[in-house]
Amino acid sequence: MESPAPLARVVPRDQHTVSRSQISPNALRVLYRLKDAGFQGFLVGGCVRDLLLGLRPKDFDVATNALPEEVKRLFRNCRLIGRRFRLAHVFFGAEIIEVATFRAASAPALGEEPLADLDPEEGEGPEISEPEEFDADIADTEGEDSHVLDMHGRILRDNAYGTIDDDVWRRDFTANALYYNIADFSIWDYVGGLEDVLARRLRVIGDPETRFREDPVRMLRAARFAAKLDFTIDPPVEAAIHAFSGLLASAPPARLFDETLK
């Protein structure tokens, strides 16, 4: 599994078990409005995984080629959060539908402190301790430093936008990298995630060492998914966790705390 991403395997509606009747009506509203405005709209991450497992998702995340500012213009009930990782939150009473723009591939660089509010690639929503409202009027949407890693490979800043073919490589586990397409109700699978979900197997997208260096908290997340969903951790992933568990000492305490509460 190496970049660039291959064309996705498109699984038609009659070959998977996800139904619109299982999806939050508010998530459907977001998806259809994006589609009607000419944008792509996909459910992505943990919600697709859970629906395939016959579980009720705790939230629904959307990925799109619309920029955060474009999402905000489509929804009066939308707020942009995070300067270092920009997300759109669309509010429907107590329910929040999170909308993220497709991300591009990593570009190593030196930078500042690691992100505490890392991206929603994990399939469980972003790790945001104190969401920061984003002022779209003064922000640079795609500066040359829009994706920055530190000397250890940890993600520092992540606003490099791309396509769905790029976005899949930014996600953590294959089980969290399935995209439900509202246009034809198909599932797009780039990395064998559908088979892994059905087999309850946890595999990392790409090289486990690289992905754990980018975000050491992924190691805790792997253990949580294995316990919560009764998944078996792939042997190379398990070996990398044993080898690089010391990297957790460099993770922001707030993110470690948040992960232990899930």
Each language-model region and where it sits:
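Catalytic cores of the polymerase beta-like nucleotidyltransferase superfamily
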Residues: M1-K262
